[in-house]
Amino acid sequence: MNSAWALLRLASPQLPIGGYSYSQGLEMAVEQSIVVDPQTAGRWISDQLLLNLARFEAPLLLAHCEAASAGDWGQLLQVSEQHRASRETRELHQESRQMGYSLQQLLNGLPELDRDARHFLEQTAEPHLALGWALAARAWQISPQDALAAWLWSWLENQLAVLMKTLPLGQQAAQRLTSELLPLLQQAQVNATRQDTHHAGSAAFGLSLASMAHERQYSRLFRS
């Protein structure tokens, strides 16, 4: 079987985990006129990529995938707890928890998940997105690096979808912005590979403040 199919499946917006229900603070950034056009949108996304994802979220996701791929359940549990403790707002915690639950329901109904991984998933009370993503990659025999690339692409695609609904940003403008951001996506993956999870960290105050404000936003398109 062509391995690219499994990778496309994991990165597909058709994966039923609800990722396109959330904006990760971007809707509030538009509401507060921090993001007003393609240029400011590009700055917001590039800052998130290089100052947050590349330094913390992506290394942690990669650590999940490496532990799951190797069947190192103790290490997977450890990084899973680190991920859970790092959610800075209620909104971000619930987002990760809901998407993790959706992945759990999906994996429970699939024959590809092996017995050890299924047992680990059953013993996990509240699986979050990174954990579910790592187990899905194991089930579909996707390498940790490819699973990280799929996750980064899904994140970027979701941010662009948010912009098309809120800014609004046209499809052609979104594609031009994608071309500008793809090198940064690659840079984020490389940085994540070099980052030890023991030293990983970021101070994404803008994201946290936007997320907290979004929890109280009067009118919104995306979930909180």
From Swiss-Prot:
Intracellular or extracellular location(s): Cytoplasm
Source superkingdom: Bacteria
Location, primary (coarse class): cytoplasm
Keywords attached to this entry: Chaperone, Cytoplasm, Nickel insertion
A Pfam family this chain is assigned to: UreF
Keyword Transmembrane listed: no
Single GO cellular component term: cytoplasm
Molecular functions (GO terms): nickel cation binding
The keyword Protein biosynthesis belongs to this UniProt entry's keyword annotation: no
Function: Required for maturation of urease via the functional incorporation of the urease nickel metallocenter.
PANTHER family, per database record: UREASE ACCESSORY PROTEIN F
The protein's assembly and partners: UreD, UreF and UreG form a complex that acts as a GTP-hydrolysis-dependent molecular chaperone, activating the urease apoprotein by helping to assemble the nickel containing metallocenter of UreC. The UreE protein probably delivers the nickel.
Record family assignment: Belongs to the UreF family.
The protein's name in its UniProt record: Urease accessory protein UreF
Organism: Pseudomonas savastanoi pv. phaseolicola (strain 1448A / Race 6)
Primary gene name: ureF
